[in-house]
């Protein structure tokens, strides 16, 4: 009788450890998928001057890609940097 209790307790302990370990691995895989993937797209420069004006560039970026944490940079042209929902598996 005592051996049966020890065996049952051992099996139960191993099962609980297995469930906890597989749950941790599942959480790590989900966290890995949640990493942000950034995209960059060029936009047209200022029509009159042909130069990139950062205020206009930021405004156009926010209008085109709303709610995606957009950022704009001006070098030779206006570039928008935003989170890519289609790469992250979001609609």
Curated annotation (Swiss-Prot):
Coiled coil: none annotated. GO terms for cellular component: extracellular region. Pfam families: SLR1-BP. Its main location: secreted. Disulfide bonds join 39-84, 52-74, 57-78, 61-80. One of its GO terms (biological process) is killing of cells of another organism. InterPro entries: DEFL. Residues 1-26 form the signal peptide. Glycans are attached at residues 35, 68. It is found in: Secreted. Keywords: Antimicrobial, Disulfide bond, Fungicide, Glycoprotein, Plant defense, Secreted, Signal. Belongs to the DEFL family. This is Putative defensin-like protein 145. It comes from Arabidopsis thaliana. The lineage of its organism: Eukaryota, Viridiplantae, Streptophyta, Embryophyta, Tracheophyta. The gene is LCR2.
């Amino acid at each position: 009788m005592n051996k049966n209790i020890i065996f049952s307790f051992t099996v139960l302990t191993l099962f609980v450890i297995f469930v906890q370990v597989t749950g941790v691995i599942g959480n790590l895989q989900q966290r890995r998928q949640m990493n942000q993937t950034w995209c960059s797209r060029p936009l047209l420069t200022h029509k009159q001057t042909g130069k990139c004006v950062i205020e206009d560039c930021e405004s156009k970026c926010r209008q085109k890609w709303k709610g995606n944490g957009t950022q704009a940079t001006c070098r030779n042209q206006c570039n928008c940097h935003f989170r890519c929902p289609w790469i992250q598996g979001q609609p």
